[in-house]
Amino acid sequence: RQMCIRDRSLSGLPQLPVRLNERPVVLNTSTGVLKGKMVTPNQESGYPVVLIIPGSGPTDMDGNSAALPGKNNSLRYLAEGLAGKGIASLRYDKRGIASSASAGKDEYSMRFEDGIKDARGWIDYLSKDKRISGIYVLGHSEGALVGMAASVDNPKVKGYISVAGAGRPAYEIIEEQMAGQPEVIRNMVRSINTSLKEGKLVPDVPIGLQALFRSSVQPYMISWYTYNPQEIIKKLKVPVLILQGDKD
């Protein structure tokens, strides 16, 4: 379908509407089909493309989370804004989320590497599009770590962009988020994290921590904890842009 957006320059003066095109795209995986949308500017070829990877939890391709009220459509607006500047984009629903729900595994079988593999699959998909002059990977929140790992040793990627990505391993962030909890809770979290970092499942999780450390999600967390963004980013051989705000 075609959309029309109005671009406003820094001067605040209204500009002519920018015509762009949006079409559905699919990626076949071993567990099912991932669905997304590609937005292209109103030109035949020679434009760069940004692969937009959404953040953690039930966040869809538009940046909306089923766990939060309302819709912000942040990633959809990003795609439209990029197109207005002559930059294409591809954004997608992660496996198990929204239109890609059928590609989801059961929670116990999920691994952080699944997301990395999917991102690389989309990069391969884009690399076959002769209209594109270069592929850039953008990840938001947890998607920043996924995109970072997918860009390492990948000659098809020309640049990497982190938007509100973590600069520390996930277990450190989780423990920091517990700073306001009673000491007994903080100690339990540290103890569970120590086991998970060692690759050990924790069978007896207190009821109050089940939402975070339930048995079905522990294998995913074990795989997630092995990724340290401070070490992975050193392996990137492409230009890197890090965007971070004062508030999450």
Regions found by a protein language model. Give the residues of each.
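Accessory cap/linker subdomain of secreted extracellular hydrolases
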Residues: 159-235
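Conserved alpha/beta-hydrolase
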Residues: 73-101
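Short beta-strand/loop motif that positions the catalytic acidic residue
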Residues: 236, 242-244
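Short, small-residue-biased leader/transition segments that mark boundaries at the very start
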Residues: 1-5
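Alpha/beta-hydrolase active-site loop
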Residues: 74, 107-130
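Short, surface-exposed "cap/lid" segments of acyl-processing enzymes
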Residues: 43-82
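N-terminal cap/lid segment of alpha/beta-hydrolase-fold proteins
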Residues: 9-45, 49
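Primarily recognizes the serine-hydrolase "nucleophile elbow" in alpha/beta-hydrolase
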Residues: 124-180
